[in-house]
């Protein structure tokens, strides 16, 4: 579905000190931005921010950064962060393909990828956020033995992503084809997940760790 342009979104985001407009300036300096030594976790494709805010409020000792491309979506994530008074969140409006310019070696402790675009056509697969090209970039700034938590409702993407992780030097430490019937207790539900689980969608989930 095409999002209607919200011309007011970018000025409102730029006016907030929770939005990082030039993130490359913070490479290697994110702990200075948060003013603490807590771990930094990323959500790639954070959407409207429910997952991000819930995680941050439940884990105030951890710093969270949500990244997404569309201002029309991110403005709602920002509003949630402000309403929640979650000081341990920053929002970055950015194409994730540029992420290598934003984080330095060993600067990030975990990545969450929730229901990303499956890019099913062969010529599009390199755009997948779990593709080996992206995974090898993430490894440049993830700490040793860090984890990537990945959720999707697309079986093809899920099964091919397992191959991507192994090829890129990750072990798969946990996997389920039906997260909500798995007994896994640390799941935080996204807006998309909540809506479509109620319609019968099964969520596939894995935790991959750098070997």
Curated annotation (Swiss-Prot):
Highest taxon of source: Bacteria
Pathway(s) per entry: tRNA modification; N(7)-methylguanine-tRNA biosynthesis
Record-listed substrate binding positions: 121, 153, 190-193
One Pfam entry name: Methyltransf_4
One GO cellular component, as annotated: tRNA methyltransferase complex
Transmembrane domains' residue ranges: none
GO MF annotation terms: tRNA (guanine(46)-N7)-methyltransferase activity
Cystine connections: none
Enzyme class label: transferase
Gene3D superfamilies attached to this UniProt entry: Vaccinia Virus protein VP39
RNA-binding as UniProt keyword: no
Binding site for S-adenosyl-L-methionine: 43, 68, 95, 117
Keywords noted in UniProt: Methyltransferase, S-adenosyl-L-methionine, Transferase, tRNA processing
InterPro entries: SAM-dependent_MTases_sf (IPR029063), tRNA_(Gua-N-7)_MeTrfase_Trmb (IPR003358), tRNA_methyltr_TrmB_bact (IPR055361)
EC number annotated for this UniProt entry: 2.1.1.33
Catalysis performed (reactions): guanosine(46) in tRNA + S-adenosyl-L-methionine = N(7)-methylguanosine(46) in tRNA + S-adenosyl-L-homocysteine
Family named by the database record: Belongs to the class I-like SAM-binding methyltransferase superfamily. TrmB family.
Stated role: Catalyzes the formation of N(7)-methylguanine at position 46 (m7G46) in tRNA.
Family annotation (NCBIfam families): PRK00121.2-2 (NF001080), tRNA (guanosine(46)-N7)-methyltransferase TrmB (TIGR00091)
PANTHER family, sorted: 3-DEOXY-D-MANNO-OCTULOSONIC-ACID TRANSFERASE/TRNA GUANINE-N 7 - -METHYLTRANSFERASE, PENTACOTRIPEPTIDE-REPEAT REGION OF PRORP DOMAIN-CONTAINING PROTEIN
The protein's name: tRNA (guanine-N(7)-)-methyltransferase
Organism: Clostridium kluyveri (strain ATCC 8527 / DSM 555 / NBRC 12016 / NCIMB 10680 / K1)
Gene: trmB
